[in-house]
C-alpha cells in the first residue's frame, strides 16, 4: 500500500517529538497500520531545525503552500494559538486535507466553525493530543464509552498548576515561590497566566464536555478561576481536615443544564484524584453503565503528546478507507444530534464549600456567623477555630453541606458586613466525587 504522507506545521517540542516517534517506531507503526507514514513536507520558522529533524522532507516557509501540496494527505497542525493556525487548518480542510491537531485553544474557541466545514468536505479532524497529552481520553469519550450516558467528568488537566499545588502542600511554600521554581524547572512559562488562571484547563474541559453531552463547544460560558490567589494556609488546613486542593475541571449534566467550570477544589484525600501529584494529569469519568473510570498519565511533554499525535495519524489512515457514514463522529454524536444545551451560571450550581474567616476573637462571633449561614439555608458540616493570629483576631474554618452557590455567596456577603469580621472571606468549592 502507498504510504500516508503528512505535512507538519510547526517543529517545536511536539512537532520534533512526532518526528522522533515516526522515526524510532517506524517498524512497529507499519506492523499495526500495514503501510508507512512518511513526512513529506514541513513548515517552521527555522529551516535548519527542519533539515535536522527530517532531511528527506520538503521544507516550505509558507503554511498555505504546505496545505495545498498534492503530496500531503494529512496536515498535522502544531503551531498552537488561533491566528495562523486557524487559517491554515481551515484552508487545509477546504483543500480536502485531513487534520491532526494538538491545539486545544483552536478547537475550544473555533471548533464550531472547524467541525461543520470538515463534515461538509468529508474530512477527518483528530485531536487526541489536545486534551491531557498522552492520555487517550478523547478516544475513550468518543468510542470506548459510546454505550453510556455520561454523568460527569472531573479532571486534573494542567500539569503546571498541579505541580505548584503539590509543592505548596509538600513544602508549605508560598505560591509565588513555587511558581519561580516551576519556571526554573521548565514546568511553567515565563508568562504563566494561561496555565495558572485556568484558561488551559478550561479549553480542555470544554472539549470533553462537548464530547460527553453532545453539545457545540461552549468555552465562552466556561467558568474560570485559577490558583494564583491560593494561600498556603488553606492547603495546610485542607490537609488537616482530610482534603487536598487541586485545580479541577468539572462538567456535569444536571436536570437544569450542564455545569462547565474550572477552579481550585477540595477533594477528599481518599479519592484517587486527590493523590495525583506533580505534573501528572488524571481524568475521572462517571457514566451510567460502566460506573466510574479513571485515566492517568503524562499530560504534556514531547513524547507523550507526540504519541497521541501519531496515534491520530494512524486512525485517519484507517478511517479514510471507510465511507463517511461509518466514521467516528468528530464530537462523538451524529452531527444532527449535536444540540445546544443550557450551561448553568455559577450561581445555580450545587456544591459544598470551604470557608476561611478572620474575625475578632470575642464572645458571640461564631454565633453571628452561624446564624447568617442558617439564614441562607446553609448547613454547617464542621466549624473549627484554628487559633488566634494577633491576640485579637481568630481564624475560623467552616465546611458546609451541599448548597446552591447563590446562597453561600449571599451568606458570605452578610458575614463580611459584620463589624467583627476583619478580612474578606476565602471560599473554595468542594467535590466529593461520589456522584
UniProtKB/Swiss-Prot annotation:
NADPH binds at residues 13-14, 104, 301. NAD(+) binds at residues 14, 301. Na(+) binds at residues 128, 131, 133, 135. Optimum pH is 10.5. InterPro entries: ACT-like_dom_sf (IPR045865), ACT_dom (IPR002912), Asp/hSer_DH_NAD-bd (IPR005106), HDH (IPR016204), HDH_cat (IPR001342), HDH_CS (IPR019811), NAD(P)-bd_dom_sf (IPR036291). One of its GO terms (molecular function) is metal ion binding. L-homoserine binds at residues 189, 200. Keywords: Amino-acid biosynthesis, Metal-binding, Methionine biosynthesis, NAD, NADP, Oxidoreductase, Sodium, Threonine biosynthesis. A sodium ion is seen in the structure; a metal ion may subtly affect the relative position of the nucleotide-binding region to influence enzyme activity, and could increase the stability of the enzyme. Pathway: Amino-acid biosynthesis; L-methionine biosynthesis via de novo pathway; L-homoserine from L-aspartate: step 3/3; Amino-acid biosynthesis; L-threonine biosynthesis; L-threonine from L-aspartate: step 3/5. Its EC number is 1.1.1.3. PROSITE patterns: ACT, HOMOSER_DHGENASE. The active site is at 204 (proton donor). SUPFAM superfamilies: ACT-like, Glyceraldehyde-3-phosphate dehydrogenase-like, C-terminal domain, NAD(P)-binding Rossmann-fold domains. Belongs to the homoserine dehydrogenase family. Catalyzes the conversion of L-aspartate-beta-semialdehyde (L-Asa) to L-homoserine (L-Hse), the third step in the biosynthesis of threonine and methionine from aspartate. Is highly specific for NAD(+), and displays an approximate 479-fold (kcat/Km) preference for NAD(+) over NADP(+). This is Homoserine dehydrogenase. It comes from Neisseria gonorrhoeae (strain ATCC 700825 / FA 1090). The lineage of its organism: Bacteria, Pseudomonadati, Pseudomonadota, Betaproteobacteria, Neisseriales.
Amino acid at each position: 500500500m502507498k504510504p500516508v504522507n503528512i505535512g507538519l506545521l510547526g517543529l517545536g517540542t511536539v512537532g520534533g517529538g512526532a518526528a522522533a516517534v515516526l522515526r524510532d517506531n517506524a517498524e512497529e507503526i507499519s506492523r499495526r497500520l500495514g503501510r508507512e507514514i512518511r513526512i513529506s513536507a514541513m513548515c517552521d520558522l527555522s529551516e535548519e531545525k527542519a533539515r535536522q529533524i527530517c532531511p528527506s522532507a520538503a521544507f516550505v516557509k509558507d503554511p498555505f503552500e504546505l496545505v495545498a501540496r498534492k503530496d500531503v494527505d494529512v496536515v498535522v497542525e502544531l503551531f498552537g494559538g488561533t491566528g495562523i493556525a486557524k487559517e491554515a487548518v481551515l484552508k487545509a480542510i477546504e483543500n480536502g486535507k485531513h487534520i491532526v491537531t494538538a491545539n486545544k485553544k483552536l478547537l475550544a474557541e473555533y471548533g464550531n466553525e472547524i467541525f461543520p466545514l470538515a463534515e461538509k468536505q468529508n474530512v477527518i479532524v483528530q485531536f487526541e493530543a489536545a486534551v491531557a497529552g498522552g492520555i487517550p481520553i478523547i478516544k475513550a469519550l468518543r468510542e470506548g464509552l459510546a454505550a453510556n450516558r455520561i454523568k460527569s467528568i472531573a479532571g486534573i488537566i494542567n500539569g503546571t498548576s498541579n505541580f505548584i499545588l503539590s509543592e505548596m502542600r509538600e513544602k508549605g511554600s508560598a505560591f509565588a515561590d513555587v511558581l519561580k521554581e516551576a519556571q526554573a524547572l521548565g514546568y511553567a512559562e515565563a508568562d504563566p497566566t494561561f496555565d495558572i488562571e485556568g484558561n488551559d484547563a478550561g479549553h480542555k474541559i470544554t472539549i470533553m464536555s462537548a464530547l460527553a453531552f453532545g453539545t457545540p463547544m461552549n468555552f465562552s460560558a466556561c467558568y474560570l478561576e485559577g490558583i494564583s490567589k491560593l494561600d498556603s494556609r488553606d492547603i495546610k488546613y485542607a490537609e488537616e481536615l482530610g482534603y487536598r486542593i487541586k485545580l479541577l475541571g468539572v462538567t456535569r449534566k444536571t436536570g437544569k443544564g450542564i455545569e462547565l467550570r474550572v477552579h481550585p477544589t477540595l477533594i477528599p484525600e481518599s479519592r484517587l484524584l486527590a493523590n495525583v501529584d506533580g505534573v501528572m494529569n488524571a481524568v475521572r469519568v462517571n457514566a451510567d453503565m460502566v460506573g466510574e473510570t479513571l485515566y492517568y498519565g503524562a499530560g504534556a511533554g514531547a513524547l507523550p503528546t507526540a504519541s497521541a499525535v501519531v496515534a491520530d495519524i494512524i486512525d485517519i489512515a484507517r478511517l479514510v478507507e471507510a465511507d463517511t457514514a461509518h466514521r467516528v463522529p468528530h464530537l462523538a454524536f451524529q452531527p444532527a444530534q449535536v444540540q445546544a444545551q443550557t450551561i448553568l451560571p455559577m450561581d445555580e450550581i450545587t456544591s459544598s464549600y470551604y470557608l476561611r474567616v478572620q474575625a475578632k476573637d470575642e464572645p458571640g462571633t461564631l454565633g453571628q456567623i452561624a446564624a447568617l449561614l442558617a439564614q441562607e439555608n446553609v448547613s454547617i458540616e464542621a466549624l473549627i477555630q484554628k487559633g488566634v493570629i494577633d491576640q485579637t483576631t481568630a481564624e475560623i474554618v467552616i465546611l458546609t453541606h451541599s448548597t446552591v452557590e447563590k446562597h453561600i455567596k449571599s451568606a458570605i456577603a452578610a458575614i463580611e458586613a459584620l463589624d467583627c469580621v476583619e478580612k474578606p472571606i476565602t471560599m473554595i468549592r468542594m467535590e466529593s466525587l461520589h456522584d
